[in-house]
């Protein structure tokens, strides 16, 4: 779900907008503080890794520390070794996680004396809300009555001033497994948005999922009047959004199957961007001769990629082939601004320049970082195997593929290319051509089993 920012709105001729995500951030921050304060004293915070990124955009570690958090752990299957009596879990309603929490509770209880004062005090908060399945698993594990349970409604995550995300990895559960939980989560998030920013009168949608969501939103509006929300009347009546457009993912399955060719898109392809964060460091090897395999890195450093990085904001949406010239332009601009110091004559001019020094230094540091990343992208993009893959994607997309193009996929399987690369190409072909002929399906299945028996067994189990 997106909303136009001032810069983007002007780009598309929509005029400026005063929309700000500050209210969303503040609501999520206040609720997080309530979650932490619900458990008195010192505590350990155990976070589902998929929630860690969104949480870091809401509150800094200093805020957690102020409200009693002594240690932070990522939720995993291993026993949780900590001296903290109080444990606060913040997790998605994942059935596997419920078993891990139960195992950790039992392990902690076994390591301490049997007196009630020494038993672990566990509180589980679900993001964005609990499910009956999770309750049932906790009951089956025998700990449902021994722990406290609540919800933390971190359902809308502001990634940028013009980009909001639910951060839900729910394509398979919704489209393959038929789990309707996603629709309810999206509906609650949109209602929350309207409570904060005013009612959106017009709903437009395309796709079956969009239709179901629209009908649910209409029912929720009847059951709950946004005018009754805890806002002042000007907020409720003066919403700057007159429409919401809902697009079902199945409307366009081709785009996510193709390699992204913008600068930001290729960073995501090579390094994987998670909630605006990416881990990048100096490569320990050049790009693989088979460019279908990204370069390997060591001593990774976590970076934030958003519009607060002025260099990144200028190049993120550009095609990678023109990024080099833009980086040169940015370098020249920074140099010209730094050279202005030689022309300064008055005290006022000196003070104005001094106020810019910090920003110029940050931009120069950012420029060096993006020059390094761009070099990696060029090595990857210039490899003949990468070019061959992109050419195959282009052919598949236009429905002009032949048996020789399918042989290219067989070649990738034989070279033990990453299974994601193989499956993306196969899925792209199937989406455009309405599936695979039986003889091709049997051939691909046989090759995958022969080359990667362990992988096929893993996929079969899932």
Language model regions located:
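Extended, well-folded catalytic/binding cores that form a central cleft or groove in large enzyme
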Residues: 1-462
